[in-house]
């Protein structure tokens, strides 16, 4: 296995472990896991997959868990995700999936 694949696999493991740790209540340890994953990403020049990149706050590195560390609001087809620790906000445009409401 190539070294970049090993690093990417480790980054994903760390982010998933951070998410599990945060659910158990240890936010400081979860932040450290995410900071470590970010460091691996920078040093290895590897992009974090979008699915995992959206799992944590980019300002304070807290795993975003709806209702615990994150608030989600939908306003006029825009999803607003707010970190409850540092009040950082991220907006995503919501679009209808192609082919989901096709009439036959």
UniProtKB/Swiss-Prot annotation:
It is an enzyme of class 3 (hydrolase). Gene3D superfamilies: 6.20.50.20, Immunoglobulin FC, subunit C. GO terms for molecular function: ribonuclease P activity; zinc ion binding. GO terms for cellular component: cytoplasm; ribonuclease P complex. It catalyses: Endonucleolytic cleavage of RNA, removing 5'-extranucleotides from tRNA precursor. It comes from the Archaea. Its EC number is 3.1.26.5. Zn(2+) binds at residues 57, 60, 83, 86. Its main location: cytoplasm. It is found in: Cytoplasm. Binds 1 zinc ion per subunit. One of its GO terms (biological process) is tRNA 5'-leader removal. Its cofactor is Zn(2+). InterPro entries: RNP4 (IPR016432), Rpr2/Snm1/Rpp21 (IPR007175). Part of ribonuclease P, a protein complex that generates mature tRNA molecules by cleaving their 5'-ends. This is Ribonuclease P protein component 4. It comes from Saccharolobus islandicus (strain L.S.2.15 / Lassen #1) (Sulfolobus islandicus).
